[in-house]
Amino acid sequence: MRPTPTFCTLLLSAALATAADGGKPNDPGKPVTFDARTANSGNWSEARTWDGGRKPRAGDFVQVRTGHVVTYDVESNDALRMVHVAGTLTFSREKSTLLDVGLLKIEPGETTTEDGFNCHEAAPALPTGGVVPALEIGTPSSPIPAGVKAIIRLRHFKGTNPETLPAVIACGGRWDVHGAPMSRTWLKLAAPARAGDTRVTLEQAVPDWHTGGRVIVTTGDLQGPEAGASFRSKSGRSKPVGTEERLITAVDGAVLTLDRPLKKAHRGDGLMRCEVANLSRNVVVESATPAGVRGHTMYHHGSSGGISYAEFRHLGKEDVLGKYPIHFHLVRDTMRGSGVLGASIWDSHNRWVTVHGTDHLLVRDCVGYQSHGHGFFLEDATEQWNVLDRNLAVQAFVSVPLPKQVLSYDPNDGAGFWWANGRNTLTRNVACENDRYGFHFQITKSPAFDPVLRVRGPDGKTAPQDVRTLPFLRFEDNEAHGDGLFGFRFGDEVHGSVSGDREHPFIAKNLRVWESHYAIRPNVRFFLLDGLRVKNAAFGIYHPNFDAHVYRDIEFDAVTAEPINGGHDEDSRPDGDFTYDRLTFKNCRLDRDPLVQITLAATRPGVAGHFRGVSVADSKSAGGVVDFGGGPRSNRTDNAVSYYFHDTGRGTVTRVAGVKTLDPVKHADYRGIDGWTGRDARAAEVKAVAFPQLLAPVDDLPPATLVTGIRVEAGKRVVSGVSHDNGEIATVTVNGTSAKITAQHAGVADWVVTLDATADGHYTATTIDRAGNVELIPHKFREPSSP
C-alpha cells in the first residue's frame, strides 16, 4: 500500500515529538557535551564542515567553534537540542531556511551551559585579536532579501526548564536579525473603511507589502471602562474588540485588497483615523508550540547586534519574570546605538519589547499586537536616553504583577507604553485598544521601593538621584485612541511627589486623544502641556495635580462629561497655580457638569487659575461654562481658589469664585452671568491682574547620540545615526567631520556622514543642540572586525 500524505505527516509529527520530548536531562549549571562540532568553515549541509563528517541530527547539542564561519543553508524540521555559536553562523541569503532548536546561544569559548537565562558569571574572554561570536540572520547592510525566508523555531524539550527554555540568548556575542526593509510598517487610513469593505486605502503606497501578508486594521470605537473586563478573548469578561485581522490578497499602490470583508467600520478622516499595520516579515522567530511552552530571547551585557524588519510571534512566557519576546537585559550602554527597527511582535504572553537596565537604544517603527501585560516596557526606572519613535501598540492586556518584579507597585495592568524614568524620548507613537492605558508614566515611592537610584547624569557621572525629579527628555506627537481607561497618565497619586521645577518642568507636546474615556491624567508638579486635541471622549484633563501647571493650545471636541476636572482626588484641592492659554470647546454638550470645573479651596492660600483665549462653539451645559462639578464636594472655604478669565472684554479680567467663598458685603458686585457661570459660581470684573508666567523652561540638557550603523562604500566609511534632545539638534560630528542631518522631527534627528577610515578603527560621534549644549558623553565606537 502506498502511504497517503496524511499518514506521512502523522509519522513525521510523531518523530518530531519523540526528538523534542526525549533526550538528556537538563543541568543548566553543567557544561554540555556536544554531539556535533564544526571542523572548519563551510556550509551547514556539507559533511566536510563537521568533525568526523557527522552532520547535526535531531536532538543534538551542536557547536560552531571559534574561528569557523558556517552558512546555515537548510530548511530542517529536525529539532536540535542546542546550538552554541562560538564562531559565526550566518543564514543563507539565497535560499529559505528553518532552524528548529531548543536553545540558541551566542557566547565565546569552547564550553557553555544549557541555561536559557543566565550567561557565565564572567563570560569567557576573546583571544587577542579574536572575532566576536556572531549569529547573523541577515545584517543591517545585507539583510535577508525579500522572497527568501529565514525562520527560527524555538522548541521545548522534555526535561529542560520550562521557565527558561526554549530561548535565543546573546551572552557577549553578536546577534543580528534583519529582514527585508520596509518603507513603512504601519500607516493611517487615507479614507474611511466601511463594514463590508474588502479594500482599504492607506496614506501612502506600500510597494514592499506583499500578498499573503497578515495585517490588522485598528479600532475606531470606544468600549469604555468596565471593572475586570479585558479586550483579551477568553478572559472571563471579554469586551467587544474593534481591531480586525486580515490577509492581503492584492496590493495596488496605497490600496490593499483583503481576504474577507471587514465586520466593522474604521475611521479614516480628520483627527480620527485608524491604522493598518503589517505583521508579516520574511525573517521570523517563533515558538514551535504556542499553546504549550513558549520561547523568549535576550541580549545580555556586552552583547552586540540588533533587530530590523523581523517578526517575533507566539513568544513570551506568561507570568514569568524576564522571559519576553525581545529583552535587553541589564545591558546599560554596552549596546549603545542598537535596538529594534521595523519589527512586529504579536501574540505575546509577556510584553513586546523590554528595555531593562539599558540606555541609548532606538526602538522605531515597530508594531506590537496582543501582549499579556504592558507592551513596550522600560523595566526598573534606571533606563535613560532611549528613543521610542513611531511605534504602534495595540491590545496590551491586563495581566498580574510578575514574581519578584523590580517595581512592585506596578500592577502590570495593560499599558501600550509603560516607563518609570522620564529621561527618555517618546515621539510619534500611537496606542490603541489597550486594556487600561495608552501611555503610562508611573513612578512612586513605596515601602518596597526607594526611587533614589544610582543613575548616570548628563556629565557621565553616576550618583544617587531621585528619579521622580527627572522630567521627560522628549514626549511629543503621541496619540491614543480606543484604550480601555486612559489615553495618557503621568506621575503618582501622592501630591507633588513627582516633580520637575520651574526651569525644568515635565513637558508634553502635541498630543492627540480620540474615542477615549479619560484623555489625560497629569499627576506631576511643574507641568507644561503644549498642544492637546481631544475628540469623542468622556473626560478631558482628569484629576490634574494643579501646581505650576501650564496648558496651551487645548482643544476639546465632543467631550461629554468633564472636559476640565477641578483637581486631583475627590477633594479637588489644587496645590498651586495653573494657567490655560488658547482653550477651545467645540460640540461639547454636557448634561450635568460645566465645561470648566472649579473648586472651593486649595491646600494653601492664594492659589489661582488663569484662563486666556477661551473659545466656545456649539457647546453647552446645564452647569454653564464655569461651575462646580457634580461629584463629591468639599465644604471647606479656607484658602479660597480664584479663577481669572483674561480678555473677556476689551482689556478686562473676570474673576470667578464659589458662592460659599464670597462675603455678601465685600463681594456685593459678584453676580451670575447667564450662559457662563453655573448655579454655585459668581463673577465680577477685577483690575490689575496679569496673566502669570508660571514656568520658564531652560534648555541646559546636552543631547544624546546613537550611532546606528557603519558601512564601507568605495573605500570610505559611511556612518549613520540618530541624535535626540529636549530642544533641537544643531550639529553632529564624527571624528570632527560634520554630518548631514537627513530628517528632524520633535527633537529627533537622523544623520549620515562619509569619512575616511581610521587607522585604529575608532570613531567618536558628538552632538550639539541649538541652545549650545555640547554632549558630554559622546558615542565612542569601534568598527567591527570581519569574521
Which residues are covered by each model-predicted region?
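The right-handed parallel beta-helix/beta-solenoid scaffold, focusing on the short coil/turn
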Residues: 34, 60-62, 68, 76, ...
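Acidic Gly/Asp/Thr-rich repetitive segments characteristic of extracellular carbohydrate-active
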Residues: 34-66, 203-214
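Right-handed parallel beta-helix
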Residues: 50, 145-147, 151-161, 226-227, 281, 291-300, 305-314, 336-349, ...
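Extracellular beta-helix/beta-solenoid repeat scaffolds
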Residues: 59-188, 207-208, 216-225, 232-250, ...
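Short glycine/acidic-rich loop motifs that flank beta-strands on beta-rich extracellular proteins
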Residues: 90-95, 110-111, 289-296, 316-324, ...
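Short edge beta-strand/loop segments characteristic of extracellular beta-sandwich folds
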Residues: 201-203, 216-218, 718-724
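Ser/Thr-rich low-complexity repeats and stalk/linker segments
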Residues: 697-787
